[in-house]
């Protein structure tokens, strides 16, 4: 079982994440490449929140394919093309991921992604003991 924590000597997280996740040595790891807001039919959502929700749906599909669940998430790295998307990102994450054990997360605002129509990309790491 992964153990998430926020050390007392570190500031309170600025969002819904934790500062550390301890993964047992016996864990099976899954690394999910950056997911964008494209559905299984190859259609890119046009609105930011829909893209963000699709990113998380894609990640959950990758977890299921490997006999993992959202509680096995250890880390995400999120790339946004505009800092004004942060609140909508958080809403999309809560809507799709819901209340799970918190995992570590890094959010970065970048000038652009692989296509100007892609507004968000999320890479994920998961571990299952």
Model regions and ranges:
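N-terminal presequence-like segments and the immediate start of the first folded domain
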Residues: 1-57, 61-75, 80-129
């Amino acid at each position: 079982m992964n153990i998430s924590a926020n050390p007392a000597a570190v500031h309170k997280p600025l969002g819904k994440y934790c500062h550390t996740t301890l993964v047992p040595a016996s864990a099976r790891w899954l690394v999910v490449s950056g997911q964008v807001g494209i559905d299984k039919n190859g259609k890119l959502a046009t609105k930011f929140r829909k893209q963000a929700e699709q990113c998380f749906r894609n990640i959950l599909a990758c977890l299921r394919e490997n006999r993992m669940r959202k509680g096995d998430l250890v880390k995400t790295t999120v790339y946004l093309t505009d800092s004004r998307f942060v609140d909508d990102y958080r809403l999309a994450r809560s809507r799709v991921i819901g209340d799970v054990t918190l995992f570590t997360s890094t959010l970065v605002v970048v000038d652009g992604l692989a296509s100007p129509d892609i507004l968000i990309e999320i890479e994920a790491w998961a571990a299952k003991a």
